[in-house]
Amino acid sequence: MSEQIDRYVSFKNIDCNARAGQMMDALQPYIQAAENPFWAYFQQKRAEFNAKGYDDLRVLHNYLPTLKELIEDDELLAQLEDLEYTCM
């Protein structure tokens, strides 16, 4: 039986940084395809945020509404929404 996680009590046992990294990896096809100017902007802002010491979870959180709008893969969108619910 899996352990029940209560994110409001603690983020203990939730590796949000790893989940955010996996999400960034999953977004690479969108970024590389560059079919929308947002992706170049997103990549630039990610680099700026990371240089300031902010992690990828913060970057994803800042652009969450736009990401939800642009992601066309239902499975990837579900992963993003799970990340939002669990870690943000």
Swiss-Prot record:
GO biological process, one term: nitrogen fixation
Keyword Mitochondrion: no
Pfam families tied to this protein: CowN (PF20543)
Protein keywords: Nitrogen fixation
Source species, domain of life: Bacteria
HAMAP family for this protein: CowN
General function of this protein: Is required to sustain N(2)-dependent growth in the presence of low levels of carbon monoxide (CO). Probably acts by protecting the N(2) fixation ability of the nitrogenase complex, which is inactivated in the presence of CO.
Family membership: Belongs to the CowN family.
UniProt protein name: N(2)-fixation sustaining protein CowN
Annotated source species: Rhodomicrobium vannielii (strain ATCC 17100 / DSM 162 / LMG 4299 / NCIMB 10020 / ATH 3.1.1)
Gene it is expressed from: cowN
